[in-house]
């Protein structure tokens, strides 16, 4: 994830799961 990157909802879920 990056600040300039627009992520789909599933990517947000994966980021949370990774603890990032």
Curated annotation (Swiss-Prot):
Residues 10-20 have a biased composition (Polar residues). Residues 1-20 are annotated as: Disordered. It is found in: Microsome membrane; Endoplasmic reticulum membrane. The keyword Endoplasmic reticulum applies. GO terms for cellular component: endoplasmic reticulum membrane. Keywords: Endoplasmic reticulum, Membrane, Microsome. Its main location: membrane. Dimer of 18 kDa and 60 kDa subunit. May have spermidine-binding activity. On the 2D-gel its MW is: 60 kDa. This is Putative 60 kDa spermidine-binding protein.
């Amino acid at each position: 994830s990056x600040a300039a990157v627009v992520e789909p909802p599933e990517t947000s879920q994966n980021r949370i799961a990774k603890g990032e």
